[in-house]
């Protein structure tokens, strides 16, 4: 049942204030001179009492909407077998001719396929939803060979808030698109699924043993340091000794630093790094490529193994 619409009628009444019966009035012979309003002691008060004022009356009248079954609108040069169909040139004209006091259960629009882009406006269909009841059906019949895109009709359904239901192709090549108005009620209730609140306190507990595991081996030494530590028998994974070391690793590190550096081979000419063109006959790097001074240990060993 559609609730009745309330129309409010406003009536403005202009009245004049009337002075009290006991109020003294000036005699007819005593007329105030222009510019002088003090000829009578109550002249100013009498002028105020005759000022008009307004009263606002409201009257509410209930007018029930007319419930109708189907509204048929023919656009452009299309035709319909419904004698009560409304003919209009465009969607804008059809919206202006519609009886807005009635509520319809279904709306039928008829348009020729060749005139779809000219007479059908996607924005105007939303104006018809005001006269449709909840769950009302809206159908658009495209007469003729509807080989062109029907995207304007689908767009109008979307802008009007309609749910697109179906599209039917007839034997003569015409198409009928159907949509339904959603029943959006203000008293509808949506169910919210909340997660179960398990306040047993176990989520706040942390296992200390899990914090000590290193599954990704992030706490270990780099591979190069580990290989060097394994080769030298170091059990500290190549890390520097502690300041208060008691395992003897600090003494071993000091002895390792006190070792003499390896002797670097060189000749008397001092031009070993420049290449064979500058080296002498007794150069130990004869036959090897040139290198930077101090990088003798990086020189490739190009000698034969035989």
Swiss-Prot record:
Positions contributing to [2Fe-2S] cluster binding: 236, 242, 245, 247
Region of interest: Disordered: 1-51, 252-272
Binding-site list for [4Fe-4S] cluster: 269, 272, 280, 283
Disulphide bridges, residue numbers: none
GO cellular component assignments: mitochondrial intermembrane space
Chain location of the short sequence motif Cx2C motif 1 per the record: 269-272
Annotated transmembrane regions: none
Record's compositionally biased regions (Basic and acidic residues): 1-25, 252-265
Any matching Pfam family: CIAPIN1
Segments for region (Linker): 191-218
Complex and partners: Monomer.
Function: Component of the cytosolic iron-sulfur (Fe-S) protein assembly (CIA) machinery. Required for the maturation of extramitochondrial Fe-S proteins. Part of an electron transfer chain functioning in an early step of cytosolic Fe-S biogenesis, facilitating the de novo assembly of a [4Fe-4S] cluster on the cytosolic Fe-S scaffold complex. Electrons are transferred from NADPH via a FAD- and FMN-containing diflavin oxidoreductase.
Designated name of the protein: Anamorsin homolog
Organism the protein comes from: Phaeodactylum tricornutum (strain CCAP 1055/1)
